[in-house]
């Protein structure tokens, strides 16, 4: 069963484990990884890991939500236009919300925020972004005294706004990693013919993705972890 499905999921072992588990596979994710490394993959010499400063872990859903924009890959767009995926990742549960737009501007960012607040199953205390002009005017010398539409909307909602340091995308690492996962699990396997078509496909993927286990959640899904928190909040 592993040998038959491995070629399809070799770049995403969590998806392989989830697929096998639905078919009655009982070994743990780590057990599956050990089997594959021993029997199916050549040994790879690991380089020394970089040591970063400790990062304060979010203790409850909504305490901090990372938001970022991803360029939709041109190889899956048939009409030659440019599209952008807005993504929000809750640091505590890894619950994720995504939408697609045909521009990345402060107007699109504000619209995404409105929809995020409506769809979020928890109250959002703080939002973190990079310093892109679709979010903030802070790096524009002529406009730095005036907040963007996105920033003003955050004020209206009473949501704390945090901008990461310039040129440190790792500080928004959870949403950055989710974008890499979305590239492999979604965009490399889809074709979109219009903005409406892309939005429908992304909406289905968004619902499905929150039920996929994650190693950082002890092999539970974001929805499973979220339900545990909501039961005691």
Predicted region positions:
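RNase H-like two-metal-ion nuclease catalytic core shared by retroviral integrases
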Residues: 129-131, 140-144, 148-155, 159-184, ...
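C-terminal domain-tail junction helix/linker
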Residues: 159, 180-233
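A short acidic/small-residue loop/turn micro-motif
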Residues: 90, 102-106, 143
């Amino acid at each position: 069963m592993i040998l038959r499905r491995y070629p399809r999921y070799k770049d995403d072992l969590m998806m392989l484990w989830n697929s096998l588990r639905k078919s009655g596979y009982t070994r743990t994710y780590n057990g599956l990884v050990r089997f594959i490394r021993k029997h199916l993959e050549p040994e790879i010499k690991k380089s020394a890991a970089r040591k970063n400063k400790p990062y304060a872990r979010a203790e409850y859903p909504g305490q901090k939500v990372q938001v970022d924009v991803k360029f939709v890959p041109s190889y899956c767009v048939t009409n030659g236009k440019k599209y952008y995926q807005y993504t929000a990742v809750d640091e505590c549960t890894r619950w994720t919300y995504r939408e697609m737009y045909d521009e990345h501007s402060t107007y699109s960012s504000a619209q995404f925020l409105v929809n995020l607040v409506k769809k979020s199953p928890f109250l959002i205390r703080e939002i973190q972004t990079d310093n892109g002009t679709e979010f903030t005017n802070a790096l524009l010398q002529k406009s730095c005294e005036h907040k963007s539409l996105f920033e003003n909307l955050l004020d209206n909602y009473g949501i704390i706004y945090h901008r990461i340091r310039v040129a440190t995308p790792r500080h928004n690492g959870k949403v950055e990693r989710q974008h890499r996962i979305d590239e492999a699990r979604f965009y490399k396997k889809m074709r979109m013919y219009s903005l409406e078509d892309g939005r429908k496909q992304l909406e289905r993927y968004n619902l499905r993705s929150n039920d996929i286990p994650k190693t950082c959640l002890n092999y539970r899904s974001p929805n499973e972890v979220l339900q545990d928190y909501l039961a005691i909040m």
